[in-house]
Amino acid sequence: MEAHESDVGFVSRRTILAGSAVLLAGGGVGSGITALAAAPETPVSAPPLPWQWVKLDPVEAGRRGYRFYKEKGGCGSASYLSLLSLLKEQVGHPWTTMPDMLMVHAAAGFGGHGTLCGALAGASVIINMVTYGEKRDEYLQNNAIVDRLFWWYAEQDFPTERFDDLSPLPKQIKVKAMSPLCHTSVSKWSLAAGVTDLHDQAKIERCAKVAGEVAYTVT
């Protein structure tokens, strides 16, 4: 296909010469070198998976998860960002290439549909990135870790008291989730706690503690 000067991204000899003339008119070759030096750096590409994992402080991960639930848009961001932020601090690249708000859409079971709990989804993203492999045994190991996390969640009495020192509502009623699904987990607890409003402070505290507990458990 023939390229034309009007095409986006096409640079002709005439365009280069015209640009050079402008640089020269503006102060000589030195000005051109300065302009080139100020050009944005080429983004560093991320390596293929799996990425490096290090042992993280589970308490710090959990406390960030609790806090990020309230500050960063719900359960999906809470678990994902609690782990990611620690990996950015302790490992650096390539984790620093990951966007902080990647999992905000997972709140309330993905767009409010009450499907998979966002805390599980956010944590699973990180798990996949450190355990992914193309060989069958690696694939099975990856799946097994996520599977165990989901089963643990379903059998857990939520919320725990682990983060009660951060909460204005300690010692909340505990109810077994029975499912990794947001709707089931939240509905069973809400019925037992007498909560009818999804924006009730008690429900917010419960889910913040759940997000913290997921982050704590993954580490």
Short names for language-model regions:
Residues 1-11:
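N-terminal secretory signal peptides
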Residues 9-15, 25-45:
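N-terminal twin-arginine translocation
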Residues 51-56, 86-105, 188-189:
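Acidic-glycine-rich active-site phosphate/pyrophosphate-binding loop
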Residues 59-93:
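Active-site-proximal helix-loop elements at catalytic-domain edges
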Residues 64-73, 106-115, 198-204:
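A short glycine/serine-rich beta->alpha loop
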Residues 80-87, 127, 141-219:
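Amphipathic alpha-helical interface segments
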Residues 90-99, 127-145:
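Phosphate-handling active-site elements
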Residues 113-125:
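Conserved phosphate/anionic-ligand binding catalytic regions in large, soluble enzymes, centered on
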